[in-house]
C-alpha cells in the first residue's frame, strides 16, 4: 500500500481549465476545413506531430488520453492508427467516417463511445450546431504515430508541409528544409490501400457502446452497505467491476479497460486499492476522491476534468452533489482488474451476506466454502 501527499495528489489532477490546445498537431493543419481543429495531449503525447504540443501529464500509464475540439463543420481527416483508438463523445455531435475513402459513417452524441479497429482509415467531422468535444484513449505508451490518407499528404505538400520518418511535422514556411526521399513519410501506395480490411456499418456498430446500450448494475461487494451500491456499465475489456454478469461489448485487447461508473447523490465506493493505474473523467461535477487509509488527502473534480490515481493507493470515490453523476473509468492492462477493499469493508459486507468468490466476483457469503488449499 502506497501513501500520497496532498501536493502529489494535486499534481495528478488535470482540470478542464488546464487543457492546452495545439492547432498545428497534424499535417492537415493548413487544409481549409481542418485548420480550426484543436488537439490536446492530457496523459502522454498521443500521436501529435508537433513539438509545440503541451502534455499535461507525461507519466507513462500504458495508454494515452487526449481530446479533440472542433467548431461545426471542421474535419479531422482520414488516417490510420497502429494501436487502439477509442472516441468518447462528451460534447456536440460528430460523424465518424471510416474506410479507404471514408465511405462508412456513424453519428456519435454525448455519452457514446466508439472503438475503431487498427489499420483502417478513420476520420470525423463536427456535424452539430456548436463546438464539440471528444476525449480519446490510445493504446500503449508509444502509439507509433499515424499514417494519413494519400490525398492528405499530397495536399499538405502544396502548403509546404511534410512528415518526417520519426513523425515530426516539417513546415517549410517556417524555414524547415524540404526533406529528401527516404527522410519523409510517402503517401501509401494504391495497392497497399486496397489490402486494408473493410468494416461494414453492422460490424462497426458492435464496436460502439452508445448511451442507450449501457448495462448499469451494482458493481461491488460493498453494495450491501449503507451509502454504497455504485453501478458500473462495462465498455471495453475486463475492468474493476465485481459483478459476474457484466460483459463488455468490446472485448479485443486494447491495453486498457473502460467502464462507466454511476454514483447517486452522496453514494460512495468504499476504500479500496488497485494494483494498476486508474484514470477517471467525470461527465458532471461532484466527484470527490479521498486518498490514503486515513482519507486525509482529497481532490474534488469538476466536469470533464481528468484525474490519475496511482497504483496501490487507497481511494474512496463519492458523489458530493445532489444529482447522479457518471464517471468514465480507464485502467491499464487487458487482464481482469482486482479491486481490494479494506478489511473492515469486507467484514461488514460478509456480515450483511456478501463476499467475493475465488474469481473475485460478488457471491452470497453463506454459499462460499472455507477452502484453504492453494497450488505450490
Q: What do these predicted regions represent?
A:
Residues 2-4, 121-199, 316-376:
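Double-stranded beta-helix
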Residues 46-53, 64-81, 241-246, 257-275, ...:
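Conserved short histidine dyad/triad with adjacent acidic residue
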Residues 1-61, 163-254, 358-376:
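A short, N-terminal "cap"/entry segment at the start of jelly-roll beta-barrel domains
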Residues 75, 80-110, 120, 272-303, ...:
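A short beta-strand-loop-beta hairpin characteristic of the jelly-roll/cupin
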Residues 58-63, 76, 82-85, 104-127, ...:
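Polyanion-binding and phosphate-handling cores
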Residues 85, 113, 133-134, 278-279, ...:
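Beta-sheet entry/capping signal
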Residues 70-72, 108-128, 139, 264, ...:
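Conserved metal-binding segment of the jelly-roll/cupin
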Amino acid at each position: 500500500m502506497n501513501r500520497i501527499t496532498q501536493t502529489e495528489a494535486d499534481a495528478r489532477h488535470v482540470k478542464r481549465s488546464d487543457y492546452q490546445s495545439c492547432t498545428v498537431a497534424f499535417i492537415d493543419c493548413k487544409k481549409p476545413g481542418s485548420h480550426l481543429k484543436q488537439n490536446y495531449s492530457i496523459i502522454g503525447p498521443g500521436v501529435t506531430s508537433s513539438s509545440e504540443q503541451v502534455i499535461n501529464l507525461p507519466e507513462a500509464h500504458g495508454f494515452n488520453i487526449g481530446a479533440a475540439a472542433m467548431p461545426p463543420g471542421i474535419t479531422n481527416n482520414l488516417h490510420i492508427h497502429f494501436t487502439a483508438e477509442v472516441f468518447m463523445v462528451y460534447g456536440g455531435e460528430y460523424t465518424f467516417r471510416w474506410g479507404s475513402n471514408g465511405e462508412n459513417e456513424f453519428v456519435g452524441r454525448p455519452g457514446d463511445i466508439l472503438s475503431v479497429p487498427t489499420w483502417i482509415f478513420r476520420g470525423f467531422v463536427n456535424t452539430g450546431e456548436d463546438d464539440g468535444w471528444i476525449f480519446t484513449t490510445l493504446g500503449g505508451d508509444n502509439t507509433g504515430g499515424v499514417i494519413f490518407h494519400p490525398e492528405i499528404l499530397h495536399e499538405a505538400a502544396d502548403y509546404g508541409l511534410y512528415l518526417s520518418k520519426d513523425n515530426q511535422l516539417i513546415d517549410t514556411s517556417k524555414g524547415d528544409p524540404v526533406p529528401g526521399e527516404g527522410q519523409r513519410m510517402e503517401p501509401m501506395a494504391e495497392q497497399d490501400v486496397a489490402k486494408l480490411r473493410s468494416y461494414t456499418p453492422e460490424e462497426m456498430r458492435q464496436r460502439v457502446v452508445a448511451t442507450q446500450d449501457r448495462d448499469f448494475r451494482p458493481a461491488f461487494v460493498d453494495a450491501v452497505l449503507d451509502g454504497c451500491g455504485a453501478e458500473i456499465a462495462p465498455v471495453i475489456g475486463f475492468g474493476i467491476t465485481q459483478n459476474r454478469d457484466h460483459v463488455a461489448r468490446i472485448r479485443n485487447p486494447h491495453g486498457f479497460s473502460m467502464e462507466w461508473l454511476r454514483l447517486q447523490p452522496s453514494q460512495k465506493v468504499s476504500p479500496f486499492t488497485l494494483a494498476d493505474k486508474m484514470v477517471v473523467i467525470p461527465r458532471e461535477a461532484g466527484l470527490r476522491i479521498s486518498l490514503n487509509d486515513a482519507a486525509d488527502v482529497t481532490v474534488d473534480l469538476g466536469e470533464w476534468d481528468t484525474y490519475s490515481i496511482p497504483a496501490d493507493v487507497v481511494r474512496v470515490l463519492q458523489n458530493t452533489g445532489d444529482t447522479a453523476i457518471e464517471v468514465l473509468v480507464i485502467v491499464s492492462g487487458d487482464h481482469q482488474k482486482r479491486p481490494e477493499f479494506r478489511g473492515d469493508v469486507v467484514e461488514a459486507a460478509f456480515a450483511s451476506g456478501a463476499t467475493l468468490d475465488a474469481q473475485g466476483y460478488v457471491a452470497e457469503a453463506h454459499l462460499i466454502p472455507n477452502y484453504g488449499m492453494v497450488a505450490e
